């Protein structure tokens, strides 16, 4: 198949005018538009002028007025050629080669010390960086446009950064802000004092071991996930007749707790003999539990994939080595012995306190009766899958967190994927991470092949009807391995992701399937059924000590001696 591409051959500035010259391959540029588009697809800025000469183009962007008469806002922008299909402009390797040839000896030494290929390219692209300083000299008010290869999408972008000094507020406003900050701090300290007072008082009156169980989460609104399976197993073993079981949940760590729960939580934490948590839970790290209390971490994810907790000490977002986070746990339950050192490291606890009973919420994956039932239910809800090969596309998000989370859908050639589906009697279900802000837009002509199931219920239910999983860095691969079916890992930004996020084991030798770093390679793997599926069963055996659907039972018996 002949591939159509857009290449950037030259970048230069004339005052506030950015010029981008380039050429196309196997693509007619007439009647097309050149735009700058941000990664979350919420901003599109049309070029002020475009000159086309055959397959050559010159785009002019006036950054001072590009946003409807205002300056180009702070963001990262792709250069996109808009036609019936969109084409993302790539950097011509000659641009990089020319920049390298012009390096000075001291620059070349600095260049050679860089670890990643994109890091080296971005070092060379500094040549094309443009700064506008207020008055020509300001260090505080600066508008910067930096050409670079984005670590989020592994594509050429223009990174626009606007730096301004903190605005000096008038005296009364400044005083108001200072007072508000003071009272917020006092309010926080008061709440902490009350919380600890209730906890310590309750703890004092419950020094002897009793029969109270608490399930609590700051990121779960109801009894679900591992909690649900543990709770149901306790009911099955009639432990609800022996223990008083309580719950305190809230949907998100940033949500405010209800007035009653503000008092219930410290009271129950001080009283409970068994406290279940399944994620980061800040308040429990601020108090000291009595020795007879069990604080049990049943982490929401299976296995040890991306680093968390103390495994990220010294990195952005990681706790410092003296932090009390996580250290309260008296037990953590995991899926296999392989996970023990990683979870002990992450939580800052002793390895002997990490117990490989299996992960409760995976029990359903081994339930044949449930499998039969859910397959029928899924076919009723998604009739498009009947008699089809079902491919689940379930990547993680890109961006630094909840506020910037997105997925670069332009990394998918939907036309080509649709042709594959037509030829192979297949459908693709897209399950995006809940954080992803930009929605998947499926063209009408593709709706017979693609379905967005991002808002669908439990993702594990979708696994029962999936024939092939395409993912990248999602821990969903552990659950899917149970089905002993193939996976492909579309990791187009692998080098940068490894550098910034870290894994417990080398990604290339760890994942149970074929790794591809371009869409062409992904389609080749699909066309040739080249999945490296032989990796799945060894992966399953390594990470699931038990494959019998009885993890909940083992955990409950281990903890309660039932």
Swiss-Prot record:
Pathway assignment: Cell wall biogenesis; poly(ribitol phosphate) teichoic acid biosynthesis
Pfam families: Glyphos_transf
EC number(s) stated in the UniProt entry for this protein: 2.7.8.14
Record's catalysed reaction(s): 4-O-[di(2R)-glycerylphospho]-N-acetyl-beta-D-mannosaminyl-(1->4)-N-acetyl-alpha-D-glucosaminyl di-trans,octa-cis-undecaprenyl diphosphate + n CDP-L-ribitol = 4-O-[(D-ribitylphospho)(n)-di{(2R)-glycerylphospho}]-N-acetyl-beta-D-mannosaminyl-(1->4)-N-acetyl-alpha-D-glucosaminyl di-trans,octa-cis-undecaprenyl diphosphate + n CMP + n H(+)
SUPFAM superfamilies: UDP-Glycosyltransferase/glycogen phosphorylase
Any one of the GO CC terms: plasma membrane
Keyword rRNA-binding recorded: no
GO molecular function: CDP-glycerol glycerophosphotransferase activity; CDP-ribitol ribitolphosphotransferase activity
Protein topology in the membrane: Peripheral membrane protein
Alphabetical list of Gene3D superfamilies matching this protein: 3.40.50.11820, 3.40.50.12580
Key words, A-Z: Cell membrane, Cell wall biogenesis/degradation, Membrane, Teichoic acid biosynthesis, Transferase
Main function: Responsible for the polymerization of the main chain of the major teichoic acid by sequential transfer of ribitol phosphate units from CDP-ribitol to the second glycerol phosphate attached to the disaccharide linkage unit. Synthesizes polymers of more than 40 ribitol phosphate units in length.
Family note: Belongs to the CDP-glycerol glycerophosphotransferase family.
Protein name: Teichoic acid ribitol-phosphate polymerase TarL
